[in-house]
UniProtKB/Swiss-Prot annotation:
Entry GO MF terms: DNA binding; DNA ligase (NAD+) activity; metal ion binding
InterPro entries per the UniProt record, alphabetical: BRCT_dom, BRCT_dom_sf, DisA/LigA_HHH, DNA_ligase, DNA_ligase_AS, DNA_ligase_CS, DNAligase_adenylation, DNAligase_N
Keywords: DNA damage, DNA repair, DNA replication, Ligase, Magnesium, Manganese, Metal-binding, NAD, Zinc
Catalytic residue positions: K109
UniProt name for this protein: DNA ligase
Domain BRCT: 577-652
Gene Ontology annotations of biological process type: DNA repair; DNA replication
EC nos: 6.5.1.2
Reactions catalysed, as given in the entry: NAD(+) + (deoxyribonucleotide)n-3'-hydroxyl + 5'-phospho-(deoxyribonucleotide)m = (deoxyribonucleotide)n+m + AMP + beta-nicotinamide D-nucleotide
Binding site for NAD(+): D29, S30, Q31, Y32, D33, S78, L79, E107, R130, E164, K278, K302
Reported cofactor(s): Mg(2+); Mn(2+)
Organism annotation: Streptococcus agalactiae serotype III (strain NEM316)
Amino acid sequence: MENRMNELVSLLNQYAKEYYTQDNPTVSDSQYDQLYRELVELEEQHPENILPNSPTHRVGGLVLEGFEKYQHEYPLYSLQDAFSKEELIAFDKRVKAEFPTASYMAELKIDGLSVSLTYVNGILQVGATRGDGNIGENITENLKRVHDIPLHLDQSLDITVRGECYLPKESFEAINIEKRANGEQEFANPRNAAAGTLRQLNTGIVAKRKLATFLYQEASPTQKETQDDVLKELESYGFSVNHHRLISSSMEKIWDFIQTIEKDRISLPYDIDGIVIKVNSLAMQEELGFTVKAPRWAIAYKFPAEEKEAEILSVDWTVGRTGVVTPTANLTPVQLAGTTVSRATLHNVDYIAEKDIRIGDTVVVYKAGDIIPAVLNVVMSKRNQQEVMLIPKLCPSCGSELVHFEDEVALRCINPLCPNQIKERLAHFASRDAMNITGFGPSLVEKLFDAHLIADVADIYRLSIEDLLTLDGIKEKSATKIYHAIQSSKENSAEKLLFGLGIRHVGSKASRLLLEEFGNLRQLSQASQESIASIDGLGGVIAKSLHTFFEKEEVDKLLEELTSYNVNFNYLGKRVSTDAQLSGLTVVLTGKLEKMTRNEAKEKLQNLGAKVTGSVSKKTDLIVAGSDAGSKLTKAQDLGITIQDEDWLLNL
């Protein structure tokens, strides 16, 4: 009996691979269903023999309570965007300056959700969302219901792979047909449907919706030499990879490929929003390294935005957490890039004046980067004596007089007690990239603020379950979850807190760099502008903004209050002893290493106290050079920087 179960699992997984991955089924649906039912019956009779890679794991109505946070072992970086051929040529020049013989891999940019899959001994252990690149959500049970994701690899590998989870157009249409029949609101586009499906707590719904994936990266160390090799290896493991790709050292040929795909993309069975161009050599990728936000060895070309005409019906003015007042146009609805658009940003008052935008105008609307609807210009030939738009003089939230500074393009409310600003600051503090307090969204912030229960971020930590229960719509179970999420956030690493404070010019990446350098929020608050400005990737603007923020008396009081509530001020990332052998040294790795992988070398250097960077400069203290070292070695020699080899590093 056990042998028959093993045979059925093997057969059904092979047939599923032929159907979902290879698009070449060798058995009929009825034959598959017959074998599947036989397996289900055997598993019901012999549950002790159920295999971890059984296809029956992909179905069922398991209801989850929520999704836990997941710390990625290997960060997921975003990509630099390009919107023109000129930007691609500039990227090519930057790469060729370091590596004249570099070739590129051009791949389709699938319009879905980035996911990370970790296998231990060949068995899928964790499937997670990208999140902020460092911390995502564990959605393993949902990803097990995606039919082309292997539950068990043929080899007993420990591997982490990355890819895009998407909803095919055919599946999207089927879902919306069902929603229409049930009188439910339809999904606007396949990407929204995929995102909503992956966040479903009922895994049975996920199984029915026929999501799919394309894998494109091995995040864990690999012995492969090129991106092309990686894709071939991923396919050999049973993953779906996209075959619409091109390898070329010529950006002209890459551009021709882009033009062809853009013309034909409507015929693809899934949505794409551009082409990703990567340096094909993994060794060159390592050499080129990363900026604070993105790899230097890749760029994402975004297709030009679709444009439609619409009429401006009215304009709403809203104030954000920094006091900037933003105009949003209400439009006659139009279909744009697969979405119904009825609102579009007008950016700021200077933009309105420059474009002479008026209520009643017919305007050209587009999606900036295929994401945010915006007004491009006015169709003057259709203007019919519309009145000039009335620019507000008073804040729409607090009624204070608005100001328009000479060096700014926007109107600004400078009242620090403006209700909308306070609510926006509170929502930002609790948001995913900041303190990540689950359940503490804008609607809850509004209720708490209106009930006079919170007025600044420290008030969040005063809240009790009883306070939350006084709000409309909050039951005991929800109140308890929110309270525990608040308490849990106290233990976050301090870069989350720093970002949550909403300091101008200080984003999440800069927050991490600052806390890596200073280790503690209090130490950062007392640091000089010069010491902050000297950190790679930052500069004078951020340093001045931090200095201005921390010298305020009310900020010092806020930090004292947060301390009294035991909110963590320490950076919880990897720290090294100041007496480590390479403590404080900036080191660059270059060339091909023979006895250790680049990741192993980088980790060893960091454990010895070094800061490993991707480029050689006057701030570089040491370079470790392997064979075939290129321009970085030459530059280090010109600058008189100490040069060591791989054996030196091994012997440390």
